[in-house]
Amino acid sequence: METGVVKWFNAEKGYGFITPEAGGKDLFAHFSEIQANGFKSLEENQRVSFVTAMGPKGPQATKIQIL
């Protein structure tokens, strides 16, 4: 598991980007990868853990958990 900070997240569109704390490019984050019950959304500057995986358009955050 890696950690990072939510750069931005659009709850209406269901996606945003996470900046990894270890450095590197921002990662795409889709609401379907958020490990939570109910309405799945993230807030700007929120700390999260995640796993980087290859998505259809390149690396993306999966198994996102709010810390």
Curated annotation (Swiss-Prot):
<feature type="domain" description="CSD">
    <location>
        <begin position="4"/>
        <end position="64"/>
    </location>
</feature>
<dbReference type="GO" id="GO:0005829">
    <property type="term" value="C:cytosol"/>
</dbReference>
<dbReference type="GO" id="GO:0003677">
    <property type="term" value="F:DNA binding"/>
</dbReference>
<keyword id="KW-0963">Cytoplasm</keyword>
<protein>
    <recommendedName>
        <fullName>Cold shock-like protein CspA</fullName>
    </recommendedName>
</protein>
<keyword id="KW-0238">DNA-binding</keyword>
<dbReference type="InterPro" id="IPR002059">
    <property type="entry name" value="CSP_DNA-bd"/>
</dbReference>
<dbReference type="InterPro" id="IPR011129">
    <property type="entry name" value="CSD"/>
</dbReference>
<dbReference type="InterPro" id="IPR012156">
    <property type="entry name" value="Cold_shock_CspA"/>
</dbReference>
<dbReference type="Pfam" id="PF00313">
    <property type="entry name" value="CSD"/>
</dbReference>
<keyword id="KW-0805">Transcription regulation</keyword>
<dbReference type="InterPro" id="IPR012340">
    <property type="entry name" value="NA-bd_OB-fold"/>
</dbReference>
<keyword id="KW-0010">Activator</keyword>
<keyword id="KW-0804">Transcription</keyword>
<dbReference type="InterPro" id="IPR019844">
    <property type="entry name" value="CSD_CS"/>
</dbReference>
